[in-house]
């Protein structure tokens, strides 16, 4: 199970806020959704047993 996670690297011209500013248990961002594009970002998770892992998913959006 994941205890906390961090989001970083969202495009600051499209997403507000563009990251979680450290480890959190919840995160919300607002997407302007004014560009048809695919955006990359990084998720870093801390598991309950202390292990860390990361993933680089993508968000695809557009008008």
Regions found by a protein language model. Name each.
Residues 1-63:
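Intrinsically disordered, low-complexity segments enriched in small/polar residues
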